[in-house]
Amino acid sequence: MDGSSFLDISLDLNTNPFSAKLPKKEVSVLASTHLKRKWLEQDESASELREELNRVNSENKKLTEMLARVCESYNELHNHLEKLQSRQSPEIEQTDIPIKKRKQDPDEFLGFPIGLSSGKTENSSSNEDHHHHHQQHEQKNQLLSCKRPVTDSFNKAKVSTVYVPTETSDTSLTVKDGFQWRKYGQKVTRDNPSPRAYFRCSFAPSCPVKKKVQRSAEDPSLLVATYEGTHNHLGPNASEGDATSQGGSSTVTLDLVNGCHRLALEKNERDNTMQEVLIQQMASSLTKDSKFTAALAAAISGRLMEQSRT
């Protein structure tokens, strides 16, 4: 029997159907979708990073602007404080403020609120009210001065001046008298091109003594030191009355200064005497005026009538 005569009874069945490979088109589609998904995820993360970066940049810009405003405000406040400190101390602590002299009316010497102009009498109620208010103010000041301790008024009333020789090239305005002083201001006055320095005694916390030092306008080789008040503590050498100034080999004590101070007191006494003479001459000339005496008599009679009514 011939082999070609046998029949092929094989069914050609595929026992592993999943082992077949996918077509190339399907593989490319899957790869592209996977890449697109990754790209989308990367784009989302990149956009989030960009938003975060923009937010941080805006916050940084705001903080920079705030810092610039704070620095500007600080500089303005600092400059304002320096201006206040430079002009506040000399203006507040200065005691010798020049007072403008005015011509006093004749009635001010006599104490009556009478206004005279070209021989005419002007007796108004406003002047009487002003005089009454002035009297009340004086009584109030007297009561307050009585309540104050005697030491306080004594400290304010005591003023002494010391003249210290120094070199004209020295601009320190320092007078060494043994005490410790704290400088709180300096100012240029009208009557002297040299500045005036203001000091406060720091030897004791509660010491009220103040010192003003300025070069003399008449003699630039002298320093004029003015002391106001009395020390409430012992001095460095247990003697408060000594005011010694040492500048190189030159020493000036109060014995030297008292002479200059005495001359100043004598000058003030002469000025007061001259003022009294002028007042007496003015009073005598006014009493000779018949119109003035008539106005004065009318004012006195009016005042007496008012007092009798009350």
UniProtKB/Swiss-Prot annotation:
Pfam families: WRKY. It comes from the Eukaryota. The gene is WRKY18. This is WRKY transcription factor 18. The keyword Ligase does not apply. GO terms for molecular function: DNA-binding transcription factor activity; identical protein binding; sequence-specific DNA binding. Constitutive expression at high level causes severe abnormality in plant growth. Residues 170-236 bind DNA. GO terms for biological process: defense response to bacterium; defense response to fungus; regulation of defense response; response to molecule of bacterial origin; response to salicylic acid. Coiled coil: none annotated. GO terms for cellular component: nucleus. Residues 82-145, 230-250 are annotated as: Disordered. It is found in: Nucleus. It comes from Arabidopsis thaliana (Mouse-ear cress). Keywords: DNA-binding, Nucleus, Transcription, Transcription regulation. Transcription factor. Interacts specifically with the W box (5'-(T)TGAC[CT]-3'), a frequently occurring elicitor-responsive cis-acting element. Positively modulates defense-related gene expression and disease resistance. InterPro entries: WRKY_dom, WRKY_dom_sf, WRKY_plant. Belongs to the WRKY group II-a family. Induction: By salicylic acid and pathogens. Its main location: nucleus.
